[in-house]
Amino acid sequence: MRTVAWTAAVLGVPVPDIYVKSADLLGGIAHLPATDPAVILGKSLLTGRSVPELVFAIGRELACQRLTSRLLTFYPTLPELRALLVAAVAQVVPSSLPSDAILLRDALRPKLQSARLAELESAVAALEERGGRLDLKPWIRAVELTSCRAGLLACGDITTAARMLAVDGRVVGGLSAADRVRDLIPFSISASCAKVRRAIGIGVTPIRGSSPPPALS
């Protein structure tokens, strides 16, 4: 699976373990809830895709997991994330919790070493200074839009990115494919996009006009 390794190298993230699935799955790729980073590739990415299309899909997924430390792999829905947040805050500020958060609170407690607990206390204090409210939905949206930008940076072609998003089938944080493309279009022609592509060694031309990565194999 050389395309996965190439994309990971471009984005500066670890190369995950790779598994394949004969059936299809949403987005064609997903991280697995395993101890070490691991992805599974579905049928739609294993056949009939160009290299830039593969790079966008893979880059988007790898970036998302790096941004969240794979948090969304283990807690993919808003209710699950909210329960985790409540359980984490309860380590510092004890309070009555719903049953799902109680289980998480008790599981987290023995895993928090003193340094981590100090970081958590600092984060909770900062949250309280802002009124104690944290809206997770904008955070999920920001992660998704940033991940799509990373996929675009790797593949270098806005048309490819738009095409892959159109068939992705996932709605993340309420963002449709059109919402994500509307964010990517101005970014694709921005100075910051060109600067980042130069910094990661790709250049400003579409990937198919420079040195392409190897095909998926």
Tell where the protein language model's regions lie, with residue ranges.
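Cytosolic-facing loops and C-terminal tails of multi-pass membrane proteins
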Residues: M1-R2, W6, I18-G28, L78-S217
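Active-site scaffold of zinc-dependent metalloenzymes
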Residues: K21, L25-L72
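Non-catalytic alpha-helical coupling and interface elements of nucleotide-dependent molecular machines
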Residues: V13, A63, L67, V86-P94
